């Protein structure tokens, strides 16, 4: 039950953020959107390091000087996995006019939702891996550390939910449809978490690889999508400052509560 509630927390964050479209009249300003994206990127980088890569290396400590190997391999598989999805799935990033991936007749709205869904996959996997480790009795992963990651992902999902629902509204969608689009973009997280838990419980020795896999996938999203988004438009340091704020928040949560 504890794990079930934990994997739902990030989805609730997305839903809360998407609900902004129901009470806000105007679309997000460019500066506000860059600030929100910067914050989300900071949280994801900190989570990748403190909650995923470091535990992956600690779990491999019996390997001695080769303790880095599972984290190294898993990290690169995660990067290549997202790179493959990036080329195989048609999607359109918020604020961009150029679609990515194979040519398609899908509408702008659908491709915008697919873009956010694409980068929610590693977040769901990250939460799933943490809870799989906790359920398996891993010494490095506690209920508190798994909950901290869920809370961190949920916090950064709030601005992400708004970032997808508000542009959908600006594209001409009704408030209800824009809200639904924001919510649907996050539904992949609990699904990914459950599937990862089911897979990880069958291959517990692979947990260091799975943890670093999720980290690699998340960092790919940050560099490929979020950093360019927070740098769009006139020069401003707001995205960078909020990146540092997001990183600090997640680091404090992980160290103080995990």
Feature-to-residue mapping (PLM):
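Intrinsically disordered, metal-sensing/regulatory segments
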Residues: 1-258
